[in-house]
Amino acid sequence: MDAENATWRKEFMWNNDEKRAEMGTKMFCDVSPHIMLNSHGVAEKMASGSKGMDFWEYPLPQLEIIILSIFLLWRLFDMLFKKLGVPIPKFTSMMLVGAVLSEMFGSMQIPCLKHIFIHYNQYMTKVPDTIGAFAFVLDWFLRGVTTDVGIMKKSGTKSVVIGITSMIIPWQIGKLLYSSREKSSILTMTEMEYTVMTFTMSMTPFTCVNMLLTDLKIVHTDFGQIAQSAGMVTDLLAFFLTVSAYVSRDETQGVKMGLAFMAFFIFVYLVRQFMLWVIRHTPEGAPVKNVYLYIGLLLAYLSYLYWSRFLFFGPLGAFALGLAVPNGPPLGSVFIQKFDSFNEGIFLPLFGSLSMIKLDWSFLRKEFGNGRHLHGHMYECFSFLPIVYIAKFATSFLAALATKIPLRDSIILGVIMGTKSSFELGYVLTAFEKDRISLEVLSLLGVYILVNSLLTPMAIHFLYDRSKRFVCYGRRNLKEKPEMQTLVCINKPDNITSMISLLRATSPSKDSPMECCVLHLIELLGQATPTFISHQLQKPKPGSRSYSENVISSFQLFQEVYWDSASINMFTSLTSAKEMHEQICWFALSQGSNLILLSFHRTWEPNGNVIISDDQTLRSLNLNVLKRAPCSVGIFVYRKPIWQTKALESPCRVCLIYVGGNDDKEALALADHMRGNQQVILTVLRLIPTSYADESSLRIHSQMVDMNRHEDQRPGDKSTIIDWTVGDGTETSKILHSVSYDYDLFIVGRRSGVGTTVTRGLGDWMEFEELGVIGDLLASEYFPSRASVLVVQQQE
């Protein structure tokens, strides 16, 4: 940079105070001899002497220093928290960086650092702030992309009750508290500032809840789904309250906003149709063209500008457009893969950190002294916020209890509904820029948001039991619903025929319909990217073969036979072996399945005598699913066709072994579905422990089975009941051996007979714990028959 340009630069940046004072609020222009964004290096200062500029005074190096410093610091905080086992969200680490930088460089007497981090806005355009705002909007768009718009329907009235009460009651309490203060004392804060504080505390935006739950890896839990749904309810409620406030002040403005929203709704609908068209024209397994991704980003920022101009809080427009993008592969997942990590790692930290740097930290230090004397901004703010927070926690907690959510989860829900994060920070910054709150109130609210975002995840981590993350509040089993909602897992081509045979035996009908999701699991090897394909949305490219062509064609034929009573949806998941059980459980949870069907890890030759495969990876998968499943699970040991011929009229002889217990009840419920099939001959073999041999106990035991049998008498019912009194496991083994050739399929509960005389002594010889004591005996190579076995475990 030459001396002339350096002189102009310094005069413009450092010596134009008088010119600014003369011009007042009017703008003025000056012309640089040369426009330079980047420096000539550290040697410039040495060559030009006092007339030269340091490299950090140029806009581009300054921006690079800010980005690099904030990135390194927030990553350092994030790794430190993980090492310590403290579950602090990423955005909280970003805000913490801003607080540390402001305190550190504000007190240090190092001009270059002050100039870069504290006073950069005085001498250059707000490029870092603009990039941070860009990232904030993009983050809202991506949150919309990952959102399942049907989540509220799945949560039902629970989320509506919690969402409405957790916003309305704190809002009213905040207004009453302000009114009482206004009458009893002289306030240093304005009514508008109290309104902003009350609104900030009453809101629980979906994006903040989703961000918190995602960072804590509990986003798919039942209470996590309810919390997100409740967040959506508060978003809608806040929208209508805001529009109502505009209408009450100016009816014309309210009408304009209503028309603007209707126009935007039509626009979102058209975008949704366009996105579905993109998916339909993207071949199965192929990536979406980049041009569609760029169009999506452009539309997101246009939506932001539209909402900023005609509605309010522009990021909501980007979020609403994100909802129009079908979540999951192939389109939604690509948006996340391409933009989320880069945005969250590089650009979003600028928003979180620079927002905290804007706070007046010297004022905060001063106010700590005034707070002890019970007056001033800090006293008013920090005596107001906890009261509204307690009101919000209490209403959320009580509403959760009222909707029959367990006590511990109700407490966690109350904590989640009080979380504060990026939305609240963006909202108070917007209020400050529009002169609705002062810098002092902004500083106090910023500190509260930081402290809240630090303590909330710690409280959740302390209260939450991660081993129960797949547990559902409602019972998901076959006894609760007449409709079978089954998730069939296909690991190998051999599983296709066996699973179709089993589904055929369950006899889907108009009175007892079946909704079946078929999940083809393919193990990823090497460094390939996990992929999830919905075969309802994507079709193979003409001339190419699908990953799951055999699976698709086979189950399509099954659906054609049962077209009026069975609904089949097919999916393919390419993921690593160690994550397959997580994929199955999450998918079953999201689809509302009440039965997961898995294949046993061993396969036999057609005669059922020689083992040809013993897949220990599949066995590990089955064990993990049994431990974590959100619904009932069935493991199918397929040793020979359960239908003797391929003709539809061929009979299938099924034996249900019933001892008692929850697993046997679930097996009985599954057998009830099979009774509707005219080709199924069902026998209930009741093994009665000698402890039940007295008349009263036997009568109670019999009623447990007879209740199911007589509840729904069907024409042509071919089911029978056979009773045996058993003294020990040896007698049980003899009975089962005696009937081994009489049946094609045995159904038994996994924990059937455990702790009773029926299985005494048999447990010592058990080889496969996933089959239970009796199931292991039936599947043993020493069992004379080669009948297939279905082992059922009820949801725990």
UniProtKB/Swiss-Prot annotation:
Topology relative to the membrane: Multi-pass membrane protein
Tissues where this protein is expressed: Preferentially expressed in pollen.
GO terms assigned for molecular function: antiporter activity
GO cellular component: membrane
Superkingdom, taxonomy of origin: Eukaryota
Regions crossing the membrane: 54-74, 93-113, 131-151, 159-179, 194-213, 223-243, 259-279, 285-305, 310-330, 344-364, 382-402, 411-431, 444-464
Keywords of the record: Antiport, Ion transport, Membrane, Potassium, Potassium transport, Transmembrane, Transmembrane helix, Transport
UniProt xrefs under InterPro entries: Cation/H_exchanger_TM, CPA2_transporter, Na+/solute_symporter_sf
Protein localization: Membrane
GO biological process: potassium ion transport; proton transmembrane transport
Membrane among keywords: yes
UniProt family annotation: Belongs to the monovalent cation:proton antiporter 2 (CPA2) transporter (TC 2.A.37) family. CHX (TC 2.A.37.4) subfamily.
PANTHER family associated with the record: CATION/H + ANTIPORTER, CATION_H(+) ANTIPORTER 6B
Function comment: May operate as a cation/H(+) antiporter.
Name of the protein in question: Cation/H(+) antiporter 6B
Source organism of this protein record: Arabidopsis thaliana
